[in-house]
Structures are given as structure tokens and as C-alpha cells.
A protein has these predicted regions:
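Non-heme Fe(II)/2-oxoglutarate
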Residues: 1-69
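Intrinsic-disorder/low-complexity, polar/charged segments enriched in Ser/Thr/Lys/Arg/Asp/Glu/Gln
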Residues: 3-4, 96-98, 148
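Catalytic core of Fe(II)/2-oxoglutarate
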Residues: 105-167
């Protein structure tokens, strides 16, 4: 399986316009927290960077099975936290994709690991992960915290073939 587009958009042009809404984060265990986001701009623009055009009409599955209003999530990872390797669910005919924006990065760690490969990202970088088909995790955070904004969508498998070689 191979991605046919750049995985990371360095210093994404809309990064400084994205903010996590005020409010309380929910505990997700082991120093990981999340907060639903009820409204956000630049959802379409985030996926367009990767030649994807998701439809909001397909967001019902994500709404019921995940944490986000329209499935936008603010994630806050504390010192020592990491994301364990996993693959997320998706309906049979779709791929669950996430365009993640690094809002704050610790001095050490916090990089995504996708398909066993560490991906170097910096603050304001946007990266793509096909979370229902690519095993993914992150490196442990040391000396700070990691804050990301995660845009979620379902993309039909036939549309994913334009950017990813499916087996």
C-alpha cells in the first residue's frame, strides 16, 4: 500500500486560523485528552490539500462512533503520553481519514508513526492518515505537551484509490 500524494503539508496556510474551542477536555487515559469541536472552518480545505473531497452527508457513522461534532476533535497529550498503535473502524465501503494539524509540539516526541514509519511534523504542519487502513501511533512526549486539531471524514474506497494503492 502506498500513498500517492504528499503525506505532510508543511506550515499549512490556514493553521494559524484554527483554534480549539474553550471548555473542558475529556480524559482518554494515559495522559491523553480530547474535546469535541462543534464548528470549524477549513474542513474542506484540509482534505483538498490531499486531493480528497469528503461529503458531510457521510459523517453520520463518525458522529455515532467517535467523539466529534462533525467529527472535529481537539486532542491534548500531556508529558509522557503517546498514542498506542491501532487501526480505527469504518464502514465496509469507506475509509476513515484524518487530516491532523499540529498546533503545539513538545521539544521531544509527539511525531506520528504511520505504517511503522515515524513522520517528522512541526507546529502548523497538516498530515494525512488513513486511520481505518493504516496502523498508526505516536512517539512518546517528553518535556512538554502536544495539541492537535483533527479533521475527520469518511471517503468512499473508490475515491481513495486516486491517492492510495489499496490491496
Amino acid at each position: 500500500m502506498k500513498l500517492k500524494v504528499e503525506r505532510v503539508i508543511k506550515n499549512w496556510k490556514y493553521a494559524k486560523k484554527i483554534k480549539i474551542e474553550e471548555g473542558i477536555f475529556n480524559d482518554n487515559g494515559q495522559g491523553r485528552r480530547f474535546k469535541k469541536q462543534s464548528k470549524v472552518n477549513y474542513w474542506k480545505e484540509a482534505f483538498k490539500e490531499f486531493k480528497l473531497t469528503p461529503s458531510k452527508k457521510d459523517s453520520g457513522f463518525l458522529e455515532k462512533n467517535f467523539r466529534g461534532g462533525e467529527n472535529y476533535i481537539g486532542n491534548h497529550y500531556l508529558d509522557g503520553a503517546c498514542v498506542p498503535e491501532h487501526v480505527d473502524p469504518a464502514p465496509t465501503n469507506c475509509v476513515h481519514v484524518r487530516a491532523n494539524l499540529m498546533l503545539k509540539k513538545p521539544s521531544i516526541g509527539g511525531n506520528p508513526i504511520i505504517n511503522g514509519k515515524e513522520i517528522e511534523v512541526n507546529e502548523n504542519d497538516l498530515w494525512l492518515c488513513l486511520v481505518s487502513i493504516e496502523p498508526h501511533s505516536s512517539t512518546p512526549i517528553q518535556g512538554g505537551e502536544r495539541i492537535i486539531f483533527s479533521f475527520g471524514a469518511l471517503i468512499k474506497k473508490e475515491d481513495i484509490k486516486n491517492i492510495y494503492e489499496l490491496q
